[in-house]
Amino acid sequence: MSLVETIKGHFDRCVISKYEGSSSKHPIIYLNSIKNIIGDDKNQPSTILLKALEKIANQYPKREDDQELLDQVAKDGIGLTVFISDLIESCENHDYKRMEKEAARLQLVSDNGLSGFEILIEIALRDFNRLGLLAYHLHRAMNFNKEIVGIWHYARCIIIEIVKKKLPNYPENHDIIFDLDNNIYSNQIETLTSAHRLWNIDSIRKTGFAQKISSWLSTHESQTPPFDDDKTNSEFKVYSKNGGRFFIEIAETLIDSPNKIVELESLRYLTNNASPKHLSYISNRIMSLIK
């Protein structure tokens, strides 16, 4: 089995987990973060990180009724028309059963299976503080070596997380330019980088994503830089210019600390996407993780 197939298998197993914890701590966030770090050396993938993927993907029991639900909706009849507004309305009314049914109907009529899933991701972004981090990582996990037959499992995963709390009122649209460098000093670095990636993502719902993100960003406050030291770690400096195994080796030491792994992966994203003037700040944040 190839590296890509192995990782996708762990993703597929993870999203059918019976997970009852906080949405912002969902194991798929941890798994996709590890996958991104593994990508720094695909020719010699880290054994430690691959073993962690398998362990985390299988730590919760499976849901067994995803296909049964889809089959039942098909059996009952899809109907002559399927409206996106029906799914949105069911989410706003916190009507879990109807929400599953409308999402299943969209799944069944969609040529590529994406329509319902993308709408659910957009709906989740209305509660960006709670669901933004998960929405990004779940979206990327689904699109990694995408198979249409498995999309319903990812859709049901986000449905289960959405309904854990009532959604806030529909957010206002804000005319905002997302400047990553102006927001980089954040105490929500994982959420910030998820927002930036979703802002620039290739999606049929990109406009809707941006509208939800702009509302969150309008309330986001950048913090005072927490480090006075302007020194940059020498190995990190080499990575910033040439790539390499810098983040892989740090991740191996932090592998039993999911929160630190997710933050580390966010700092990796900043390394590759923020202005070089922030490298000392990023370096200091990385070093603070391993102290």
Residue ranges and their predicted role:
Residues 1-291:
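Mature, well-folded catalytic/scaffold domains that follow N-terminal targeting or propeptide regions
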